[in-house]
Amino acid sequence: MKEEVKGIPVRVALRCRPLVSKEIKEGCQTCLSFVPGEPQVVVGNDKSFTYDFVFDPSTEQEEVFNTAVAPLIKGVFKGYNATVLAYGQTGSGKTYSMGGAYTAEQEHDSAIGVIPRVIQLLFKEINKKSDFEFTLKVSYLEIYNEEILDLLCSSREKATQINIREDPKEGIKIVGLTEKTVLVASDTVSCLEQGNNSRTVASTAMNSQSSRSHAIFTISIEQRKKNDKNSSFRSKLHLVDLAGSERQKKTKAEGDRLREGININRGLLCLGNVISALGDDKKGNFVPYRDSKLTRLLQDSLGGNSHTLMIACVSPADSNLEETLNTLRYADRARKIKNKPIINIDPQAAELNHLKQQVQQLQILLLQAHGGTLPGDINVEPSENLQSLMEKNQSLVEENEKLSRGLSEAAGQTAQMLERIILTEQANEKMNAKLEELRRHAACKVDLQKLVETLEDQELKENIEIICNLQQVIAQLSDEAAACMTATIDTAGEADTQVQSSPDTSRSSDVFSTQHALRQAQMSKELIELNKALALKEALAKKMTQNDNQLQPIQFQYQDNIKNLESEVLSLQREKEELVLELQTAKKDANQAKLSERRRKRLQELEGQIADLKKKLQEQSKLLKLKESTEHTVSKLNQEIRMMKNQRVQLMRQMKEDAEKFRQWKQQKDKEVIQLKERDRKRQYELLKLERNFQKQSNVLRRKTEEAAAANKRLKDALQKQKEVAEKRKETQSRGMESTAARMKNWLGNEIEVMVSTEEAKRHLNGLLEERKILAQDVAQLKEKRESGENPPLKLRRRTFSYDEIHGQDSGAEDSIAKQIESLETELELRSAQIADLQQKLLDAESEDRPKQRWESIATILEAKCAIKYLVGELVSSKILVSKLESSLNQSKASCIDVQKMLFEEQNHFAKIETELKEELVKVEQQHQEKVLYLLSQLQQSQMTEKQLEESVSEKEQQLLSTLKCQEEELRKMQEVCEQNQQLLQENSAIKQKLTLLQVASKQKPHLTRNIFQSPDSSFEYIPPKPKPCRIKEKCLEQSFAVEGLQYYSEPSVAEQDNEDSDDHADEEWIPTKLVKVSKKSIQGCSCKGWCGNKQCGCRKQKSDCNVSCSCDPTKCRNRHQNQDNSDAIELNQDSENSFKLEDPTEVTSGLSFFHPICATPSSKILKEMCDADQVQLKQPVFVSSSDHPELKSIASESQENKAIGKKKKRALASNTSFFSGCSPIQEESH
């Protein structure tokens, strides 16, 4: 018996989660508002929805469970089925609400979801009912990509055995699903935890732990009274955690994730269609439960025998407003569903009758499934053109098959021949090895013919004759081996050309056999090329081995020479070290000067001998390295030969395997052909039978056709009358058709424009959401920088700041960051207001009744025709445009395929050229080895001639050495005299410097040897010197160069200013003298004509400043310091520190100075005159005699010239009030 109750609606609970951190960072705002004390939620400004329960973001899990779910559990113990369904967008909190990620460790956690709380409540109620016996069974499944997977089964293979069956009395059953009997709550929790671990979860852009499947946790409860065994109740509790609906542009899913999302949305769409059908009475009784497996499993829960609660989970963020609105509408439609739950009573007799009825129904279904008819074939005769093309095609196919057969046979024969060649090569290698052993035994060649003549023993003579014959046989065998090697190379080349010249076969009907033949031909070609390359490599290796054997004696000889040379070098090195030590000791002792000179000469001789020996040693080592490189090349060639042989063996094995597979395939195909022929015979028999039946039916149809013709004639007359009436009606309707068409066209155009503008608004809304997300990220970054104390970036979005704001003090930086944050937050609020306004307009435009109102405006068939005509015209134009685009796309694809074919051909051509180049390279290497062998033989001959020359030259060298020693002794004596002369010159220059310093200290005019500064690139100028009485012209033997002489003329003394008139008188007696050109080695400083601004200047290139020794123009020079004169004066004081100290005339000390200098900068004219005077001084040469006292003579000869230079300087300084006018100006510090 079943006790029926009234239909009750599906209860709906709305739960809203709080904003997550990602949404807060993106600047999302809340788009939902809740009415206090009422189960009502408002979207935007005026869009409201009412449900059974509404839970705002602050509601806890326990309140949700006690308010909405707990009443269902009490009905379960009364025999009612119950379902708790969680639906919503991905990331809206469904799994959190249901407790899909629950573990045993979270038992006392307040945030546990619905499923663990249901388990606790169930066992709590069971413990209270002691007069009932309970049997609880648990099952857990998931629907992943429209496949049912058992989460309690360890192996996923059982998933193929799970099927859905429908029982008219008990409802939906799942056959093959694992059900576990549980006794306590911990067993149930362990089953839940096991299923949660097996459930498919993945990460998307919206949720890091997104459920990728629909999960259903079912608890089956059977309760019996202990006193009455016949009365029992059965009930099921389904706890459903649906996967969230998602959009690909937000989740950014790809690959498997995208496929999963498509299947999830498909299942939810079918569920929505079922909910719409159940909630709308106008659509009739048909409900599309069979569109997906999810709706079939929930068939009892929606509109069936169950108390159902739907928990709609939504996100409050305005970026998810569209999905939130869809969820709210979805839940609102679910409230209209009416379920009819009943108490499930299960007596045994009712169960038996039910099973019998089920068997009968299944038998009927089975009989119906075996019935059916075969459709008749339609024979169409081909045209003559088609027939000729088919015949031509058949002939080409037969020819192709014949050619492919011949190609496969030729490939097989080639493979066999190549295998034989490989075997003969292996035998040949063994014979060559034995032949090599015989050659080694025959290495010591003896003139056996003479030995036979001298021997007397007859038996010994016979043995020696046999040995002679064997030697002749060995020589013949070696010649034959060389000929065979060349023959194999030639045959490999011929076979290669044969394979290459084979014609390309077209595609035959039997694709597999053609591919097999082509593969065999390709592998045969590769094998031939491999044999050819192997033969070339072996010949090259053999040639290089012969060269190595010939190099062996040369190597031993060179090794001995290297040892001898190294010993000689060591002995000479020791002798050199001893001489160096003796020279060092001799320097300390002045009496051993001659002996040290001999030792120094001997040291130079030893160094020359050591250099010659090292050179010879290096040449010998080069030849040894050549031997090592050839050995390395030979080993590398042998390794390549081994690899090529292995490759050849693998290729042969592959060819055999391919042939075996082809043989098996051919055998199987022959067997299938026999079976098909047998079936064809049976079909021919059935066809004859059907033809007889068809003949009988055609006779019956002929009679019926005649009857139908008579009825047709009567019908024609009736239709003619109806046509006349229709034409009259059409004339009346055509008048109003034109106005209707125009009206429908305008209306459809307006509707399409509204839909297009709605889509554009959605696009603008997405753009605003992205902009707000970027602004929120900028605000978060600025706040982090403000907390960390960093300066703001140089460039910020939507605002620019001045240089002072960016690089100001810390307080200014903090103010700028605060202003930027304030500005961005203002823009963020503006974007949020724009988003809310757009969303509200979209809500108004996309009302739920809009599609219904749109089609209800078409009331008559005439309006529908006009609308369809307009839409068809638009569709045709769009189709034409699509076809044009497709044709252009196909053309581009065809051109791309042609380009790919050309590329493939070019690649093949390149590979062919590469193989030819490798062969040429091997041949060139052979020629190189032959040349090396020839050069080595020439080298031996040249060494022999060198030894003979060395023996003849050794006697002449001894005579030359004796004369060389005598000359060395004379040179040592001369060197000692030069050293003494140098010491005297140094003492003379030191005395000269002291003399000039004394003259300066006594305020007399210094008489120094003037230095010659002649620029290397300046022209030689002849300046006539002053006349000197009784001047003796002497040959210049030595040129002196002193920088100190210029430093004394930089600042004239007060006494020189007083004697200005006398100097002017002396200048009139000036006599020209001939200049002497100075060598470039004695010149210091640069001689630039320009600004000294780049590295062409010698001073700047050496990273030094230009000074007075430079011949550049000081007015143009940019490489001089302003305080050059002061630094020169300081250096002069430091040089004369040992004798006395000169005071700086520019230094002014309060109370000590005898006058106060006037601060005045020199004019450009004065500077130019002084620079000209300095240049004249630099360019005038001097003659230095080599008498007993050359320094004193030079001072006397230059006294007249020094007066002329001093006169020009005094004239320049007299024009100003201070002698500071000739110096560089010094910047005064502001006090």
Curated annotation (Swiss-Prot):
The modification Phosphothreonine is found at residue 800. It comes from the Eukaryota. The keyword Iron applies. One of its GO terms (molecular function) is microtubule binding. One of its GO terms (cellular component) is chromosome. The modification Phosphoserine is found at residues 395, 802, 811, 816, 1224, 1230. GO terms for biological process: microtubule-based movement; mitotic cytokinesis; mitotic spindle midzone assembly. Residues 1189-1212 are annotated as: Disordered. InterPro entries: Kinesin-like_fam (IPR027640), Kinesin_motor_CS (IPR019821), Kinesin_motor_dom (IPR001752), Kinesin_motor_dom_sf (IPR036961), P-loop_NTPase (IPR027417), Tesmin/TSO1-like_CXC (IPR033467). Pfam families: Kinesin. Residues 351-1000 form a coiled coil. It is found in: Nucleus; Chromosome; Cytoplasm, Cytoskeleton. Residues 9-337 form the Kinesin motor domain. Expressed in pyramidal cells in juvenile hippocampus, granular cells in juvenile cerebellar cortex and in adult spleen. ATP binds at residues 88-95. Its cofactor is [2Fe-2S] cluster; [4Fe-4S] cluster. Keywords: ATP-binding, Chromosome, Coiled coil, Cytoplasm, Cytoskeleton, DNA-binding, Iron, Iron-sulfur, Metal-binding, Microtubule, Motor protein, Nucleotide-binding, Nucleus, Phosphoprotein. Binds 1 [4Fe-4S] cluster. In the presence of oxygen, the [4Fe-4S] cluster may be converted to [2Fe-2S]. Belongs to the TRAFAC class myosin-kinesin ATPase superfamily. Kinesin family. Chromokinesin subfamily. Iron-sulfur (Fe-S) cluster binding motor protein that has a role in chromosome segregation during mitosis. Required for mitotic chromosomal positioning and bipolar spindle stabilization. This is Chromosome-associated kinesin KIF4. It comes from Mus musculus (Mouse).
